[in-house]
Amino acid sequence: MRQTIKEIETNVAYRWFIGYDFSQPIPHFTTLGKNYVRRFRDTQLFESIFLRILEEAVHHGFVKPDVLFIDATHVKASANKHKYVKEIVEEQAKKYQELLDEEINQDRIAHGKKPLEKKTETSKKEVKVSTTDPDCGLFVKGEKERVFAYSFHTACDRNGFVLGAKVTPGNVHDSQVFEDVLNQVRKTFAQPQAVAVDSGYKTPYISKTLLDDQIRPVMPYTRPRTKEGFFKKHEYVYDEYFDCYICPNEQILTYETTNKDGYRIYRSNSQVCRSCPFLKQCTESKDYTKRVSRHIWADYLEEVDHLRHTEENKQIYSKRKETIERVFADMKEKHGMRWTTLRGLEKVTMQAMLVFAAMNLKKMATWLWKSGRQKVNDQNTFGIFIKLLNKLPLLFVQRGSLSAICETDYGLFFLPFLIDIG
């Protein structure tokens, strides 16, 4: 803000934008800073701006929310990766843990097993917390590099308009925030027909959620994580009728138990495996027993893999590089979001919503201009922005006045954000 005020004192374009003449004194930077703290902290101001611009894009018919593209990207935090403290924290339980526990016990009872006792103690883990910005999270980039970062979980449509976003610490996995982003979009738009995601979201629960809600999941192929020289899991055929697996040597692996993570365990007969010619390609177990796991929601994953081969899924997934990946590329390359200069989850969320609002606004202004529906004097992106702000009566007392206490033009208030994101 200090540098912005300094630039305004000598930059004619900035003065013109905020409506100040050459002789009019510029307010002190603390006037704007304190006014923001008093009026807009802990409010939904920036989300309201984002939604209002998105509403305008919908009005012009530019938004196509029938197919969603959801992904996340990491933005480096304004924090030194060498300045941290180690803390012991409780592991956060999965949002669907109660549903999973209930179905695990039902499955165990159906197989003649006792239900698992409810876990009372919460597991703990050691994490590194930045002393500069405690809200960010340590993100492992590649095999060696570790940086403190934030994750921007984002959803866009087939035209590249951002429909929803959520910011979390960088150590939160993408799949844990998927449902929050999806529900955020569903509050504004009708339920999508399809959702395209990358392999990080290919989990049993997400597959179940989408299929149960009659949403078409569009997910990629994932390579089997098997040691080289060993049989792949798909070479063990599951027999649904007899609830067993058949190994490549046509021997039976019978049900053993269902564990606390929701996986059924099937085991072979060690006496048969001991003399099997494929033993070295099957297992390294010292007791000559092969075990295969299958999640209780594996049927949903199998349906996802079946849909992956359809022409519709192939066409939708091929659009990811033109939609959500393009959004992240523009955000970092054209809007200065390779790293954030702000600290704290609240401020970074504010910055993210402003950046995405600006991206939607610029795309809408460009499309209006190309379609010939925008008047000549309204082609300027800032002009459209001001018109949209005028339609937010809850945010401003009157045009040109940011507050009753501080007589400051709102163009001056938003100028530093537009400089950063423009």
Predicted regions and their residues:
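Anion-binding and metal-coordination hotspots
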Residues: Q3-T10, G19-G422
